[in-house]
Amino acid sequence: MSIITDVYAREVLDSRGNPTLEVEVYTESGAFGRGMVPSGASTGEHEAVELRDGDKARYGGLGTQKAVDNVNNVIAEHIIGFDVRDQQGIDRAMIALDGTPNKGKLGANAILGVSIAVARAAADYLEVPLYSYLGGFNTKVLPTPMMNIINGGSHSDAPIAFQEFMIVPAGAPTFKEALRWGAEIFHALKKILKERGLETAVGDEGGFAPRFNGTEDGVETIIKAIEAAGYVPGKDVFIGLDCASSEFYDAERKVYDYTKFEGEGAAVRTAAEQIDYLEELVNKYPIITIEDGMDENDWDGWKALTERLGGKVQLVGDDFFVTNTAYLEKGIAEHAANSILIKVNQIGTLTETFDAIEMAKEAGYTAVVSHRSGETEDSTIADIAVATNAGQIKTGSLSRTDRIAKYNQLLRIEDQLGEVAEYRGLKSFYNLKK
């Protein structure tokens, strides 16, 4: 009765109006699962391949019909007949069927859509919530959210090099309260921006994209919003930055060129100067987490940054690790970073995603479950965050339904768990020594 009888993919749109995949899986019993695949704007060069059609006459070349066809005409016939509860077996079968190290033949988007749909169908078959199916009886930790309320870099037209300025309500007693705090700060920030005559249009991830006078102006304005909402920076609410440094790193000159986003007169920093600058920010502001502070291929820079700041602040590898255990294993061995960002479409299956989270935890690294800038109404990452007791999640600002869908799912999960639910706040940053 739990045998897969049908697999079907279709092309749908993501939050940027670009095509992506939606996959449905059916079983003999009538159990059903649907998965939708996100897409990134600033992507690491080592990520699994997102298969696009390349036909400029259709969606500007971004169509996903090839990936859809790979699901319907290749993958389907290989996994029909599997027990839907055999997640690892199905994921491994798809990896073998693709046969490439980066899923470039079938497309990571095709494989991931099936992987998510299989998990959802299994949960439906067993009549349990997805987080419970994936995590088992010890599922209980609601993640501390990192809310991207200022969008810069490749996520907006704002002239700021850093891609994300986040608030982290780690001092809240529950996830529900953390979400309320974040929403109140978001609205306080909007009021401050209006008073300054700055833009309140939002970027890809729902954060504002104003024309700040550099990084410090952005951070200081957020601190004012935290205080205006009635909270204490560095006690109730902390700051997080996603530098996305690979987006403005000049590999030929080996410098971090802020002029790419901030224009003439902006800083151009060597790796050593980049580390010095990040240290200045950490010493000046209540920053608790920095993502991709160095370029994805600057291993020496990452090691130096970790040696300098690794005990004070969370250093998250996104483009640096691309949710890949091979890169993470190297990072652990070389003491580079102390946290990994988890993006399901960087690696392409739930099995490999869970492997990366497990490896990180065993090494004392934190794992931050994350959305992509091109999202859908699919809320699977909320369930993954709770299922793995990851303790941290990045899923955008307090606007745009594609972001709010994940927050609302976490509210439901917290409500369902009842007294068992734990919100660990600062304790979720167990990689810090201070």
Swiss-Prot record:
The UniProt annotation places Mg(2+) binding at D242, E291, D318
CC annotations in GO: cell surface; extracellular region; peptidoglycan-based cell wall; phosphopyruvate hydratase complex
Q: How is the cofactor bound?
A: Binds a second Mg(2+) ion via substrate during catalysis.
Its subcellular locations are: Cytoplasm; Secreted; Cell surface
* UniProt keywords, alphabetically: Cytoplasm, Glycolysis, Lyase, Magnesium, Metal-binding, Secreted
What NCBIfam families has UniProt attached to this entry?
eno (TIGR01060)
What is the protein named? Enolase
To which species is this protein native? Streptococcus thermophilus (strain ATCC BAA-491 / LMD-9)
